[in-house]
Amino acid sequence: MGELQTHMQLQTDTIHEGVRKENWFAKAMNIKVGIIPLPVYALLFILITVFVMHHDVKSDILTSIAVMAFFGFTFAQIGKSIPIVRSIGGPAILATFIPSAVVYYHLLPNDIVKSTTEFTENSNFLYLFIAGIVVGSILGMKRETLVKAFMKIFIPLIVGSVTAAIVGLAVGTLLGLGFQHTLLYIVIPIMAGGVGEGAIPLSIGYSDIMPISQGEAFALVLPSIMLGSLCAIILAGLLNRIGKKKPEWTGNGKVDRSEEESPALEESQSGQQMFNLSLFASGGILAVSLYLVGMLAHDFFGFPAPVAMLLLAVLIKLFRLVPASIENGAFGVSRFFSTAVTYPLLFAIGVSMTPWDKLVAAFNLSNIITILSVVVTMMAVGFFTGKWLNMYPIETAIINACHSGQGGTGDVAILSAAERLELMPFAQVSTRIGGAITVSLTLLLLHQFY
């Protein structure tokens, strides 16, 4: 009897606890800037201010998380609050390019810039994000969809790239930029796969073949990459808006029309599995391990680490090498990164990897029109080719947009603007494989005919 009374008392206490009135502080905790409760946001502001005043902003993981979360979600929230801007990927644009501008104009404390840059460069933070998103997205797909989508996606990518190159060359030449300049310093760089795997090998190759220094070539190549990426981000945001008005054109992250329900739960024995912390951790370790294998592939064979990781994840999915429970855990990791890490990462990218002066250097009318013609053509061809192949046209257009982005950093920004980070595996194919083919063919042909 005593045990029954105790049990009933506990139930009563629980009910009272559930219906208790919230005080003003608890209510304030429900107001958020991004995912940060307002009181915590205010505390972070005070802490960061104190650290800056004492020149004590460290580049360790704890301080870096606080700094990047504070600024990343601040700029994203501003982007979400501006009516027109939020419709064209405003949160991603502001979280990336405003930090770049404030660094260039020395409006951000140097201690913040230094700590963020050191953490980003030394921690491989970007590739941890890509590993979590790519592996989780692939393991969350249906096997049949995975095969169909990867087989089909090369068609709009190839057709879009060739058509965009032709249109870009025609537009640039007509605007007086010259055939050679348009091809080598505008069209090819846009599709080269970013800075590390595009601009740098291109500029080295140009300097070996033509009478130009590597530094001069790099300075000519980089602005087109930056502006091309910005155009792709804005257009991806517009496509997201169009998709909300024309739902029949989009799979909301699914690529092939044969894909039906949420892929991550296709073989789940229980909806609770995704939230099992042990499985979540297993999925995260799997993603990290696959990326490390990719790094070895790069060291021994020169194969891009993200592509090797992607191929391994595809093989694991195709041959069912891990149980469905761990697949769901990996999918949970990708959801965590897309929800909590995207905007802090974009802030870090803006501070440490996006030179504002190079972006501004491309801002003349002829360059803008030519670059825009390349990106628009690539996305438009992706849209209509995808539709013809019975794929979701908005998704195929967004994947094609990643071929005109800033490499891995551009993929994150473009897919964030489009609100489709689950397309990261296809974006990596578009960026890494498409970029490598573009650079290799360009230098091979240039060597033969220059």
Swiss-Prot record:
Signal peptide interval: none
Membrane topology qualifier: Multi-pass membrane protein
GO cellular component: plasma membrane
Any one GO BP annotation for this protein: citrate metabolic process
Molecular-function GO term, any one: citrate:proton symporter activity
Subcellular location: Cell membrane
Catalyzed reactions per annotation: citrate(in) + 3 H(+)(in) = citrate(out) + 3 H(+)(out); (S)-malate(in) + 2 H(+)(in) = (S)-malate(out) + 2 H(+)(out)
Domain of life: Bacteria
Region (Disordered): 249-268
UniProt entry keywords in alphabetical sequence: Cell membrane, Citrate utilization, Membrane, Symport, Transmembrane, Transmembrane helix, Transport
Effect of residue 402 to S: Retains 55% of specific activity for citrate transport. Retains 52% of specific activity for citrate transport
Membrane-crossing residue ranges in chain numbering: 33-53, 65-85, 88-108, 119-139, 153-173, 218-238, 274-294, 296-316, 336-356, 365-385, 429-446
Residue intervals annotated with topology Cytoplasmic: 1-32, 86-87, 140-152, 239-273, 317-335, 386-428
Chain ranges on the Extracellular side, renumbered to this chain: 54-64, 109-118, 174-217, 295, 357-364, 447-450
Coiled coil: none
Recorded family membership: Belongs to the 2-hydroxycarboxylate transporter (2-HCT) (TC 2.A.24) family.
Cited function: Proton motive force-driven secondary transporter that catalyzes the uptake of both citrate and malate. Is an electroneutral proton-solute symporter: the number of protons transported is equal to the valence of the transported anions. Translocates the free citrate and malate anions. Citramalate binds to the transporter, but it is not translocated. Is strictly stereoselective, recognizing only the (S)-enantiomers of malate and citramalate.
Stated name of the protein: Citrate/malate-proton symporter
Organism whose genome encodes this protein: Bacillus subtilis (strain 168)
